[in-house]
Amino acid sequence: LAAVSVDCSEYPKPACTMEYRPLCGSDNKTYGNKCNFCNAVVESNGTLTLNRFGQC
């Protein structure tokens, strides 16, 4: 089973769009889109990972 991952190399970004494409983080929090998720990954110093695509 392959791990689900997202390329966050272009982040952090100062502003994210309102586009809703949810991702579920390893903290069991639903992030609205890749931008919001990747900004949180950067803030967590890489400890936050992706559980799955879609809501938690």
From Swiss-Prot:
Alphabetical UniProt keywords: Disulfide bond, Glycoprotein, Protease inhibitor, Repeat, Secreted, Serine protease inhibitor
Keyword Glycoprotein: yes
Cellular component terms (Gene Ontology): extracellular space
Subcellular location: Secreted
Residue(s) at site: Reactive bond 3: M18, E19
Domain notes: Avian ovomucoid consists of three homologous, tandem Kazal family inhibitory domains.
UniProt name for this protein: Ovomucoid
Species name: Phasianus colchicus colchicus
